[in-house]
């Protein structure tokens, strides 16, 4: 398994540098500066994904972005 990408109990994945925001997720090492769990619909950029915002149609559009 890629040490930079860890599975999340919620079914997504997270990348960690700082302490991970995803409960139950720990990463051995990482070169990423971000850490977040990504929903299934954001799988295309799950490795470098940051999920933010609330819920709802408008929030969903802005929820996922990829780390540079």
From Swiss-Prot:
Sequence positions that bind a divalent metal cation 6: 38, 42, 45, 67
Disulfides per UniProt: none
Entries under InterPro entries matching the protein: Metalthion_dom_sf, Metalthion_dom_sf_vert, Metalthion_vert
UniProt note on tissues of expression: Brain.
GO cellular component annotations of the record: cytoplasm; inclusion body; nucleus; perinuclear region of cytoplasm; synaptic vesicle
Top-level taxon of the source organism: Eukaryota
Annotated residues for binding of a divalent metal cation 4: 34-35, 45, 49
Annotated a divalent metal cation 5 binding sites: 35, 37-38, 51
Gene3D superfamilies, alphabetized: Metallothionein Isoform II (4.10.10.10)
Keyword Metal-binding: yes
Keywords: Acetylation, Copper, Metal-binding, Metal-thiolate cluster, Phosphoprotein, Zinc
Region (Alpha): 31-68
SUPFAM superfamilies noted in UniProt: Metallothionein
Binding site for a divalent metal cation 2: 8, 14, 16, 27
Binding site for a divalent metal cation 7: 51, 64, 66-67
UniProt similarity note: Belongs to the metallothionein superfamily. Type 1 family.
Protein name (record): Metallothionein-3
Organism: Bos taurus (Bovine)
Gene that encodes the chain: MT3
């Amino acid at each position: 398994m890629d040490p930079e990408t860890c599975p999340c109990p919620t079914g997504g994945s997270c990348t960690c540098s700082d302490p991970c925001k995803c409960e139950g997720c720990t990463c051995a090492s990482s070169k990423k500066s971000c850490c977040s769990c990504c929903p299934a619909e954001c799988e295309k950029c799950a490795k470098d994904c940051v999920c933010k915002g609330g819920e709802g149609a408008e929030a969903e559009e802005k929820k996922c972005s990829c780390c540079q």
